[in-house]
Structures are given as structure tokens and as C-alpha cells.
């Protein structure tokens, strides 16, 4: 089993361009697994962890409701935002500057074949990262992602998640609000969940801006420990 994970920082990149990039890696990995099974070979698959910041964009998962986008195409353009229907799980979410967006493209045959465990460990990596900033975050029953003050009228989401998997290969991932402009969430019903607020790390800490690279380093440390991975930086 290959537990090496190649970490790639893509910088600020258009959503569609990044999605295509993910799809190419995903397809190569799935195709190699099919070839190995068909030909009886054991060529190792590779694992990747992509990090990116997107320009303002809304994405709707395959089980989502387009009615959860609350603005018109004209209003989208006025806000310099785009909209895509995509092939991950979940409903609608927002990506933009000030978020850490992570796309692990892993062959879970290299780790464990359990999608539920995969999602819970991704959540745990975020929870442990936020705890380093003194924030107590947690899961909300039946709602994937990471939240604060669950079970109270003040419950708010700080990290959204939505993934796709085929033949135990994953793509898509999570978006952690660090310095994000939360006003963009007013244009959607985030994750299709009415009456729940969103927040970001800088708002919770009362700081103007938090270093994204520092947060990413902490997150990768916890990911490495939880997945027992070997990180390789590109």
C-alpha cells in the first residue's frame, strides 16, 4: 500500500480549471486500478492533496436543489461570481478568497476502504486544527462538516465538505473559512440547511486576518497523523 501523499499548492485558480485538473488525476487513478485488476498487475496508485483558493464561485452537488441559489445570473455577474453544477455529494456551497479549499485525491485501498471513516477523519483534522486556535468545534448529527455551538440557537458552520468516490478513489473535499467574506453566503441556503449561520476563523478570533499557510500546515500535520500518511511536497 502506498501511503505517500503528494501535496500540491495550486494558488489562486479558477474553479472549472481546478475541477478539470482533479478529474484528470481521478480518472488516471481509477483507470490504473481497472488495468491492474484486468491484467493482474500491481502498479501502485498515487495519492494527492490539492490546496487552492478560488475566485468567488457557488457549486451545487448532484443531490442539491438549484432553488438554494437565491440570486439571478445577472446578480452573479455583478458580484463577479460563477456557478457550477458538479458531481460531488451535498448541496450548495460557496468558495472564495480567504478559504482553505482542500481536495484529497486518495486511493482508499492504500489506507482503509470506508467512506464514512474517511469523512469523519477529514472532519477530525479540521477539529484538531481549530483547537490549536482555542476553538471548540464539533460534528453536527446528520450534517457533514464542522460546526461551532452545535445544539444551540447559535450553531454555525465553519467548514463545508462534499466528496465523490469511485472504486475507493476520492475527489472534491472541504472548504474551511479562515478569512472568507461571509457576505457571499447570504446569496445561498448553505448546504441546503435553512436557519443555520456560517462563520470563519478570523471572525471567531476577532482578528482581521489569519495566515492561511499557517492554518494549512497545522491541518496537514493532523491529516498526516490521522491517515498515517507520508507527505511529499511538490
Swiss-Prot record:
Keywords: Acyltransferase, Cytoplasm, Transferase
Domain BPL/LPL catalytic: 43-231
Entries under PROSITE patterns matching the protein: BPL_LPL_CATALYTIC, LIPB
SUPFAM superfamilies: Class II aaRS and biotin synthetases
Chain sites annotated for binding substrate: 88-95, 160-162, 173-175
Compartments in which it is found: Cytoplasm
Record GO biological process: protein modification process
UniProt keyword Acyltransferase present: yes
Pathway assigned to this chain's UniProt record: Protein modification; protein lipoylation via endogenous pathway; protein N(6)-(lipoyl)lysine from octanoyl-[acyl-carrier-protein]: step 1/2
Catalytic activity, EC: 2.3.1.181
Chain positions of site Lowers pKa of active site Cys: 157
Gene Ontology terms for molecular function: lipoyl(octanoyl) transferase activity
Catalytic EC class: transferase
Active site: 191
UniProt catalytic activity: octanoyl-[ACP] + L-lysyl-[protein] = N(6)-octanoyl-L-lysyl-[protein] + holo-[ACP] + H(+)
Alphabetical list of InterPro entries matching this protein: aa-tRNA-synth_II/BPL/LPL, BPL_LPL_catalytic, Octanoyltransferase, Octanoyltransferase_CS
Entry-linked Gene3D superfamilies: Bira Bifunctional Protein, Domain 2
Entry GO terms, CC: cytoplasm
Taxonomic superkingdom: Bacteria
PANTHER family linked to this entry: OCTANOYLTRANSFERASE (PTHR10993:SF12)
Similarity comment: family membership: Belongs to the LipB family.
Its job: Catalyzes the transfer of endogenously produced octanoic acid from octanoyl-acyl-carrier-protein onto the lipoyl domains of lipoate-dependent enzymes. Lipoyl-ACP can also act as a substrate although octanoyl-ACP is likely to be the physiological substrate.
Something else known: In the reaction, the free carboxyl group of octanoic acid is attached via an amide linkage to the epsilon-amino group of a specific lysine residue of lipoyl domains of lipoate-dependent enzymes.
Protein name in the entry: Octanoyltransferase
Annotated source species: Christiangramia forsetii (strain DSM 17595 / CGMCC 1.15422 / KT0803)
Name of the gene: lipB
Amino acid at each position: 500500500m502506498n501511503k505517500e501523499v503528494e501535496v500540491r499548492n495550486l494558488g489562486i485558480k479558477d474553479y472549472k480549471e481546478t475541477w478539470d485538473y482533479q478529474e484528470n488525476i481521478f480518472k488516471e487513478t481509477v483507470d490504473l486500478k481497472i488495468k491492474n485488476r484486468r491484467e493482474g498487475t500491481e502498479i501502485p496508485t498515487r495519492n494527492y492533496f490539492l490546496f487552492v483558493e478560488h475566485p468567488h464561485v457557488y457549486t451545487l452537488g448532484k443531490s442539491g436543489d438549484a432553488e438554494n441559489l437565491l440570486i439571478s445570473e445577472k446578480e452573479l455577474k455583478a458580484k463577479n461570481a460563477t456557478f457550477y453544477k458538479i458531481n460531488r455529494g451535498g448541496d450548495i456551497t460557496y468558495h472564495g478568497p480567504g478559504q482553505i479549499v482542500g481536495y484529497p485525491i486518495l486511493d482508499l485501498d492504500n489506507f482503509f476502504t470506508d467512506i464514512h471513516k474517511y469523512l469523519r477523519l477529514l472532519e477530525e483534522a479540521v477539529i484538531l486544527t481549530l483547537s490549536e486556535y482555542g476553538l471548540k468545534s464539533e460534528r453536527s448529527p446528520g450534517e457533514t462538516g464542522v460546526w461551532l455551538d452545535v445544539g444551540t440557537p447559535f450553531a454555525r458552520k465553519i467548514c463545508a465538505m462534499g466528496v465523490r468516490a469511485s472504486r475507493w478513489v476520492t475527489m472534491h473535499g472541504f472548504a474551511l473559512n479562515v478569512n472568507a467574506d461571509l457576505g457571499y453566503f447570504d446569496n445561498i441556503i448553505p448546504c441546503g440547511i435553512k436557519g443555520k449561520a456560517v462563520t470563519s476563523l478570523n471572525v471567531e478570533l476577532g482578528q482581521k486576518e489569519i495566515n492561511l499557510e499557517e492554518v494549512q500546515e497545522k491541518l496537514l500535520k493532523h491529516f498526516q497523523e490521522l491517515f498515517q500518511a507520508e507527505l511529499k511536497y511538490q
